[in-house]
Amino acid sequence: MWDIAKVKASIKPFVFALGRFFGNLYKEFVEKGCQKSAAALTYMSLFAMVPLMAVFYSMFSMFPAFDGVAQQLQDMIFSHFVPETGSEVQQYLANFSQQARNLSAAGAGLLVVTAYLMLTNIEKTFNAIWGVKAARRGITSFLLYWAVLTIGPLLLGAGLAMSTYLLSLKIIVNEYDAIGVTNLFFSYLPLFTTSAAFTLLFAAVPNCRVPIKFALIGGILTAVCFELLKIGFGWVVANSSFSQIYGAFAVVPLFLLWVNLLWMIILGGAVFVRTLAERGYAHSSSRYTDLMAVLQILAIFKEKSRTGESVTDGDCVRAGVGLVHWQQLRSKLTEKNWIAVTDSGFYVLCRDLSDVTVWDAACLVGATLAELEKTPRKRSRDGEWREEFSKRKDLLADDAKAHYGISLQALFSPQQVEELLEELPDEQSEKSK
């Protein structure tokens, strides 16, 4: 028999931990301004959706093998990603994109720019969630967006052709599938593809290293929430009076609401992945103070600069700094131009370390005197610089004693304080001799 008291006692800490986690998740969601970002992305999506569809159609028209695939892909997207109310929206967008394909070269270029701005806005939002202030620049940014706008449609078309082949194969396999495994596979296939799409979005869009295991967990959870949203949204629309109030115009506010909710789920998934990463690397972040962490990071940069190599996110994480901790310090280092981000997404040293002091590093991270005097336990990853730092810490303690080694009687007498302060430099010079 189960001991109910023991079961409750074992479950209670887990429930509290889960509650704290989702409480922090909601707090991060609000603090990062995800609701406002979702509204902005909804507004941008209305302008970018037609250009994106026009670009997709243009890419498919360049390859005769994909003839007719564009319409199939559009039908598949609206059947799996938009509730039942999206049929009218699909027709409107198809008409708009058809007209967009008849534009002049200047008009087509403007549409491509609109789609490009949509992608940059998405990246900025994800970077804000991850605390990354430096966006992709130069050739890296161009290649990423070019791949999305050109190779992306072709990959989707290839995937659709493969799914068509599987559907034809399904007819043959069904004759031999007595237990219905094939039907089960095809019923969950949209969930698998949606999970893969969200995982790729969470892992590739932010301009930082995102652990793939956390991106995968976030992608699956977001896909599940997305499917639940489709069901719930369809039920609400079917049982509401939108059509009676707005008539044929009801499709516009409903579609706006749907896109806004979709972006909120996507941004919530991004915050979830970030929160998972923060908790997963919390033990690494807490082992170093900010000062010791930035010294450890700069030691890595110095070692890499000797051989002309650049530094990756993984180099700093493997040094024990911690992913989230490293991202926080990276923002400060890039703001002060101590390090720079290359077009490949790696990092190089910008300052001559012979001109940088430990005091400069302490001011960079806002370290206090107590943190300077405190030396954490030495770890196997630390270099020889740690011993020299400990010596300086002892000298700092002696210097602090010289400044604060006065009696309270003298402290409370302003005249004696002035005399002692005048004598301090002479005493320190004699001590140094």
UniProtKB/Swiss-Prot annotation:
It holds the Pfam family Virul_fac_BrkB. Belongs to the UPF0761 family. The chain crosses the membrane at residues 46-66, 103-123, 142-162, 185-205, 217-237, 247-267. Its main location: membrane. It is a multi-pass membrane protein. Keywords: Cell inner membrane, Cell membrane, Membrane, Transmembrane, Transmembrane helix. This is UPF0761 membrane protein Sde_0901. The lineage of its organism: Bacteria, Pseudomonadati, Pseudomonadota, Gammaproteobacteria, Cellvibrionales. HAMAP family: UPF0761. It is found in: Cell inner membrane. Disulfide bonds: none annotated. One of its GO terms (cellular component) is plasma membrane.
